[in-house]
Design a protein with these regions (language model features):
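Helical (often loop-to-helix) elements that flank the catalytic cores of nucleotide-handling enzymes
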Residues: 319-361
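Cys/His-rich microdomains that often coordinate metals
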Residues: 8, 27-30, 169-172
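Long, low-complexity, charged/polar intrinsically disordered accessory regions
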Residues: 48, 53-173, 369-541
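Short cysteine/histidine-rich zinc-coordinating motifs and their immediately flanking basic loops
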Residues: 13-19, 35-36, 175-184
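Intrinsic-disorder-associated, low-complexity terminal segments enriched in Asp/Asn/His/Tyr and depleted
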Residues: 12-14, 28-29, 38, 43, ...
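Histidine-centered divalent-metal-coordination microenvironment in nucleic-acid enzymes
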Residues: 1, 165, 202, 293-327, ...
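Cysteine-rich micro-motifs
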Residues: 16-26, 161-167
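Signature for HUH/AEP ssDNA processing cores
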Residues: 169-170, 174, 182-310
Length: 541
């Protein structure tokens, strides 16, 4: 095809051409001051540019693209060339945002993005759901994605990490707060009487794998100038700030037990399970019960969260509660007191251990909890930790990924090169290398250390709870859907046919989704401040 004539340079563009569309959710963007988009135009990239967007990158098949036809007048041809030149001056993100904004189904696309809170990495689904009356077979409700933009529905990614998806992590933190709080104060089908039962806030730490630099006071003061076997000073007279990169780093990396650190992480979940079992046994023994009959008299409920310390070692915070044999609905026995529970927790934390598999390269290690054990009772009279503060702390931490705490990355490491290029400290990198090395030893194959090198060998969930502690994430999501007005047909039959067709955003879609998420966050903060002001005004009356 011969080249089109009449192309103008950017300096000689027709400035009277149609303005660029306004983008939603981004008040300060230079394009937002322009006129609204012309929805009659279905060409997102201009009449000279055809687009072939992969369905996994954005909304399915490309929108209809208008091409230059022989019926176009010279003025139409000039306008098309001018518009194409103007678009080429913009970034890929801006061009893609204009393409989306000029689509006829742009309003519905905005509704989907707003409904998922501006999710940063939505899942794209295609299919249908039909709800039928269980008796007559009458269709009560039907939904199909064929009428949606790109013939697909966008749903939340539900990632808990704020570094991956801030909107979904904020929602997950809110669910976690209500889950933990319900187990402390009641609510969500948990009776309010649990607030008067024995409840503890427990902290268990990892053991020492070698001296590390600390923050606050003088780091490691010594009167002598002793050195380790590798010729490095054993002391450190500096006062490190909390943001000092040295905080958490070994005083001597050659003396540090990296193997023990990684293997302790790999067995931390098993160590917690044995701790819970031993607490039950000690409670039974302390009141003269046969250990196997403890479940007939009481039940131990808990919710625990794992947190990385500055030294990149996991420690555990847990809410522990003593109930009757049927859980929250039963009162605990008369002998069940907070003091008795504290004694059992401390004794079990010092006693339980896990032995690693014997390896000719490493031998057999005995793994225990660290010596720093804290168990504080939770009271309703304000003496001790506040219930809401405990729930808020746990909820805040579940949104943090390994990369945010500086103790790993949020994505798996598939080869040695990934470890060497990871944006982490040398201490964390050495832990990753140790995971990779130990993962090649046959005796440690079941631990899958290479697959979990990005979390330094720790394989457990960030938040775990016992079955009877409180509600569940699924129940909270169902309650939220009901609150949003989703119809519930208890006696109906639902037929679902869905398939995964992609995930994520194109550059322009990500740009607008971020703006929508920011606007929603600002609106929530304004509503929270208004609610606080209203409560304060009512309190002064």
């Amino acid at each position: 095809m011969p080249p089109l004539q009449g192309r103008r340079s950017p300096q000689n563009l027709d400035r009277t051409a149609s303005p660029l569309p306004r983008l939603p959710g981004l008040r300060n963007h230079p394009l937002t001051s322009q006129a609204p988009p012309d929805h009659a135009r279905s060409d997102p990239h201009g009449p000279l540019r055809a687009t072939h967007h992969h369905p996994c990158r954005f909304g399915g098949p490309p929108w209809k693209v208008t091409t230059i036809t022989p019926e176009f007048t010279p003025a139409d041809r000039r306008a098309a060339l001018n518009r194409a030149a103007r678009l080429r001056q913009l970034s890929e993100t801006d061009r893609d945002a204009i393409r989306i904004a000029q689509d006829p189904k742009f309003t519905r696309w905005l509704e989907q993005i707003t409904a998922i809170g501006g999710c940063s990495h939505p899942v794209h689904l295609s299919g249908s759901t039909t709800t039928l009356d269980g008796t007559t077979g009458e269709i009560l409700q039907h939904y199909d994605t064929r009428t949606e933009p790109g013939e697909r529905l966008l749903v939340r990614c539900r990632n808990r990490r704020a570094t991956v998806c801030a909107p979904c992590s904020r929602l997950h933190a809110g669910d976690t707060y209500h889950l933990v709080r319900a187990g402390l104060l009641g609510g969500k089908n948990v009776p309010a009487t649990i607030r008067d039962r024995p409840r503890l806030f427990v902290t268990l730490t990892a053991p020492s794998f070698g001296p590390v630099h600390g923050a606050g006071e003088r780091c490691r003061p010594r009167r002598d100038r002793a050195e380790c076997d590798h010729g490095r000073p054993l002391g450190c007279a500096a006062v490190h700030d909390a943001t000092d990169p040295l905080v958490g780093q070994p005083v001597c990396a050659d003396c540090y037990d990296y193997t023990g650190h990684v293997l302790w992480h790999a067995h931390a979940s098993k160590l917690w399970d044995r701790f819970v079992i031993d607490v039950r046994r000690r409670l039974a023994s302390s009141v003269g019960l046969v250990q196997s009959r403890f479940a007939q008299h009481a039940r131990l409920s808990f919710a625990r969260v794992a947190e990385y310390q500055k030294r990149a070692a996991v420690h555990v915070h847990a809410v522990v509660r003593l109930d009757g044999p049927n859980g929250p609905d039963d009162e605990p026995p008369a002998w069940g007191t907070a003091e008795l529970l504290i004694g059992a927790v401390r004794a079990s934390a010092r006693r339980v251990l896990v032995r690693t598999s014997h390896s000719p390269a490493v031998g057999e290690l005995v793994l225990r909890w660290g010596t720093q054990i804290d168990a504080r009772p939770l009271h309703t009279n304000g003496d001790g930790p506040d219930d809401d503060a405990v729930a808020a702390y746990v909820a805040k931490y579940v949104t943090k990924g390994a990369s945010e705490t500086g103790a790993g990355t949020d994505h798996p490491l598939t080869n040695w090169g990934d470890i060497e290029s990871a944006p982490v400290s040398e201490h964390v990198r050495t832990l990753m290398r140790t995971c990779w090395h130990l993962g090649g030893i046959p005796e440690y194959q079941p631990l899958r250390l290479r697959a979990w090198a990005h979390t330094l060998g720790y394989r457990g969930h960030i938040l775990t709870k016992s079955r009877a502690y409180s509600t569940t994430y699924a129940a909270l999501r169902a309650e939220r859907a009901h609150h949003m007005g989703h119809a519930d047909y208890p006696d109906a039959i639902t037929e679902r046919h869905w398939r995964y067709v992609g995930s994520g955003h194109t550059p322009g879609a990500a740009f607008m989704a971020t703006g929508i998420a920011d606007d929603l966050a600002t609106a929530r903060e304004a509503a929270r401040e208004a609610d606080s002001s209203t409560r304060g005004a009512l309190g002064t009356r």
